[in-house]
Amino acid sequence: MLAQATYGYDHQSKTALTDLIGMLLGSVSLQDVQMHTPCVNPPLKATVKRLISEVICRYGVPETIESDRGPHFNGEENNLTVDTNFFLLGFQLSHQLNIFLFCLLLVVYCGTICGNLLIIVLVSTSKSLHTPMYFFLTQLSISDILLPTDIIPNTLYILLNNGASITFICCMNQFYFFAASEEFECFLLTVMSYDRYVAICNPLHYNYIMTSDHCIRMAAMCWVLGFSITLMYCVTISLLTFCGPNIIDHFFCDLVPLIELACSSTLTIELEAYITCFLVLVIPIIIVIISYINIIVTILRFQSNVSRQKAFSTCSSHLIVVSIFYITLLSVYLYPKGGKSLKVNKLLSLLYTVFTPLMNPIIYSLRNSDIKKSLQEFIKKCVICQNGINNL
């Protein structure tokens, strides 16, 4: 609104605007953000900085301010770019709630690492689990270790400091591994649905179709697609101009908060986002739905109740994981912004970045007799080894 009001201003108005911007820049320094000093009113400062950015991006930097921009700015002519730092606001909670959330996330992170490592160890050491379904489960566990490791440590730091600055490179690294893990999981869950479809609907050809080489190629393709598609995002984001204020009202570097800070055109990256959404979300969801429709129809044709229960038990865990993952993901990125607050958005993001990786090994362990049996055998082996060491 400030930019529109000053459209076509004359020399006198320009001088007054210059003085106004000078006073605002003096009172709302970007050093307040970059040096971790607490903001008296962060939303107000963010609004003021955004208004300043709109004016400067549209009309250029006034001459009286040009000489005083200091080391925090670079760029030429009409571009004002904050050098390298962003500021993550986090959850903006009271000190007591921050401590509680810190402890909760720390426990969840430790449980996530231990649970997924246990799945990987069990599948690797138990011959009865050397099947395509459990091979894909180990790949899911690797992704579930990578994602929270990328998000939680920095989130814990933000909770302790009530916000934290992050360099552009670190922000891009965090976004890269976050998005790559999510996209990989979208593709992998689709492959796992196909695996269950072949096992239930075409069991006689299962061993011929789902060979070890075929499984390795499909898993590798999921990793390659996830990391290569995300690289395209990072390249496009690096070409954007950020006029400031570079304040991200989130607990990690996500795509939407990042492009909202850009003062240059975001048409290219928005187009990439729509195309990627179709390739990574829409198509996999359609494949998963079609696969499970065929699976359910096939299972209902079984005459034996025992066969039905066994078939449902092998698919139910995967179906629960798929449902939780896609529901939380779609609620964050496809649900209209006007229908939910920033706090709700952060909560939903917390679910699929932190709690879903914890739930996956629990769901597969509690509802899978093969993993339970392998866990019992693994514990017996550990006890025998410990007794042997003690007897030496």
Q: Model-flagged regions — what are they?
A:
Residues 76-392:
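Transmembrane helical core of 7TM receptor-like proteins
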